[in-house]
């Protein structure tokens, strides 16, 4: 499994991306290489181009076929369209060609509280589309019948184009595959899965099911050659598709087996498994860890926050993401259960853990503790592009180093860097009368690790990310 998973994604670094050379694929089909592959079909002295081509290699064409609207691919065809070529694009993504400015006008605010986590690789200037297409359409160009196939996955509305030229059946497949069984990236598959009742943020590789369906559709088309938007031309399509599907399924099976989400969405995770792995998914689910139904009396659960009570009745709050939390703290304070608040600890920057901090500070002017990797993102959230980041900067910040400890009202508090759910994440070890509790924010549940969203940068590598967190837990004193 590890070998399959490790070979799935192309590493975009020196030596990681295979660069093709310009060459003839057939008597009437030529590969032209630029930032993206360009496929040039010539008939009757005229040209049709798929994807695009550098201006110094192809000056004009009658049509340019776009497989999807991602900027890194679509820009390759812009110059040809500006010189008169008719742009053909998927109907489902037409708005990204026609109205990209609307996306960017909304972006300065939409990037906060961003649960959808879709790509920002959107065109910055429009490309006029002369014709839109969808699966089942057939384009007639100079005697060639070009079949349009819906192939969502890498993007929601992508299409592929299939045509036979000189007896060779070509598939121009965009980014559904790279080389002999790879994928350019997993980040682009993030999406909601409505039939599993999984929202965008929790939809880790949510379009993997659609991608596999698209790959199987292409497999059934009897292709001789696949020309993706980038990377090497694929001359053994069936083998490449089967390899990629096996790798995708291996990665997804591994992901599901240790996902924290199963604790919250058990039935939904069964649905996720069937969508990608089939009716008998055989996921080696991690055994559920023991969990404590009721914490000790000095820990008061308040929604997704925890209020620590000291020996004198003073309080120390962990996270504050909603008004209901502030209202409950105020109620406890007014009722005498709580005798004032001494501090607030932030585990991570997500809005459901920080949104009500300012409201809390208006009523309890306390220091806001955070471990050093969080200092900048809490003070300058607008400088970051990360999921569900809250807009307002936090004030009253008191930044401490990893491992910093302090006594507080009969407890010992130790602050830890804990880059689990997201790279900017912390934990708090609280000790009282021999009881030790590590508050880990959203990093773990009894079913595994909280890895819903690839853009959180939850890393898996020796000494980093979740493995660093597990090492930290192993190093805790027994108790």
Predicted ranges, named:
Residues 5-16:
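Hydrophobic h-region of N-terminal signal peptides that target proteins for export
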Residues 19-57, 160-174, 178-179, 285-334, ...:
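Conserved beta-strand hairpin/beta-sheet module of binuclear metal-dependent hydrolase folds
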Residues 23-24, 41, 136-141, 308, ...:
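Short acidic-hydrophobic surface loop/beta-edge motif
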Residues 30-31, 123, 128-130, 150-152, ...:
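Short Gly/Pro-enriched turn/cap motifs at secondary-structure boundaries
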Residues 101-129, 176-200, 242-256, 382, ...:
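Active-site-proximal loop/helix segment associated with metal-binding centers of metalloenzymes
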